């Protein structure tokens, strides 16, 4: 498998909307790092924040990756223009999708090594992301 990192994305948690009158705090609004080195620790990438630590972050969910191979479906089926970090991912990948990666798989890019620890579930904050429908599994 030739898995490539297209983009490393980070963001700060902020209020992105309201649901049932309550502010929704989210770290979904990430931007691509440009010209910097990403330092990845046990709890994620330096400079990145997660808002709801009950479903994001921690040692088993420190970095969220999303395959660019899924973009054509979003464009065709939902009319959503995709770019790196559209779905709040820390790593925008190319060369494999969720069918090619299993929990426990390890990936190495130059020095760092990453392990697939769990499958992500959509966060409540996805409901506040413009143009991205919320899905529950």
What is the predicted role of each segment?
Residues 1-128, 134:
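Electropositive, beta-rich accessory/interaction domains or terminal extensions
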